[in-house]
Structures are given as structure tokens and as C-alpha cells.
Amino acid sequence: MEPRGLLALTVLAAASAGELEADGGWKTDHSEQMVGKGPCNVEVRDSLTYSEFVHRYAYSKPVIIRGITQNEQFRALCSKQSLLQEFGNRLVRLSTANTYSYQKVDVPFKEYVEHMMKPQSLDSLGSDTFYFFGDNNFTEWDSLFRTYVQPPYQLPGTTGAYSFGIAGAGTGVPFHWHGAGYSEVIYGRKRWFLYPPEKTPEFHPNKTTLSWMFDTYPYLTEVDKPMECTIHPGEVLYFPDRWWHATLNIDTSVFISTFLG
């Protein structure tokens, strides 16, 4: 058996025996958690048929679906120990945490995890903050991505494209929009803020979501407040095409999105 296969079996055996830590080794000190999970006004469903998905949510509003994917194997392979052992010396591309993410830098994955991935500070600009999300090398990381089970409901005429990331507490991407997609957290918690296409949120594209949380969010009137919710492992958030959204990682988080295009 190839070493890669042996690694996967070892990790899965540890997980099944209950030896894998609940956070996968992606620990977050309580002092690093600057925000809580907040309220949730996004509809949460424990079960959903494809017909319901298409007619009630696909083109009109976000929804959180529980238990829609079974990703125990992918989750086990995303533990800190497993990813560092398998991909530690591989280069990953970091992007700035601002709306347009213009700047990129390539570093070894181990260097990012052990030295660069830190909690977000309030005085840092998004344009000066690099973190790992998207721009994935699907060839070098194929042994991981081929184990992921994407949400089963797709829009007619679309296919799914993955965006995988790992980031420290307090990090996130400020408001932006693109096509429809899903977001799933593998470890940690991710807080989402959403506005419909016709309602442009008040934000600065080079400031972080964390600074927006402290400088703008508390002063929003009821009519200007976003839809929001925090997603946990085992939950998938669907967002329709062109919906504004910003994200904030409450903990050190491992996450994957599936963009439908």
C-alpha cells in the first residue's frame, strides 16, 4: 500500500477510536476569541428535498442545512497533524483579507501554519493581512480533495468548484459578492453576514470584518442590519447568486466552499 494510503488509514483509525481531538489540533485560546457567535436569523433546516431547495432558496435567500454531507474521512484528514505531515512542505498561495484580494504570496504550508497564521488584530488592515483561502493546488492536494463529499443540490447547468482554507481567530473576508455556492466548516466556527443584491452594505473594502464588527455593526439600525448566523461543523450554508457576504472566523477554522458555476 502507498504511504499516502497508510496515512489516511492511520488517521481514520484514530478518529474512529475517539483519539482525534474535537478541534483536530487546531486549538484556539479563549483570549483570542474577540467575538461570539451572535444571533441567527438565517433559516436552518434539518432536512430538505431538492424540490424545496430549488423553489424556496436556490434563487431567493440563504439557508443553513444540517447533516446534508457525510465528511468524516475528509474531516479526519484535515486535522492539523495530518495536513502538516502530508502537505507541510508544499507551497500554498496566501491572499490578502480585503474585498478584492489583489496581493498574493506563496509560502510553505508549514510556515504559514506555524509562523504566519495568527489571530486578527483590530488595528491591522485587510490589505495587510494574508491568509490561506482559495487559490488551491488541486493536483498536489488531490489526495485530500477527492475525499470531500460536496452538497448534493446543484443549480441546473452548474458544477461545483472548491475553495479550501485555514485561518486564525478573528480573520475573515469583508463584504463581496460572486456566484451562488455553499460554505462548510470542518473545524471551528465561522460567522456569516449577508445582504441581498439590491442592498449594498456599509463597509470599507480594505478594512477587516473584525474592525467592521466593532466600528460599524453596533450602530446599524434594525432596517440596515444583515442576515447573519454562525455555522458549525456538520452545517452547510447556501448563499444565492450575487448576495453580498462577509465572514468572520470565531475560532481557528478549517473550511471549504463549493462555488456553483
Question: What kind of region is each of these model predictions?
Answer:
Residues E2-V236, W244-G261:
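N-terminal accessory scaffold of Fe(II)-dependent oxygenases
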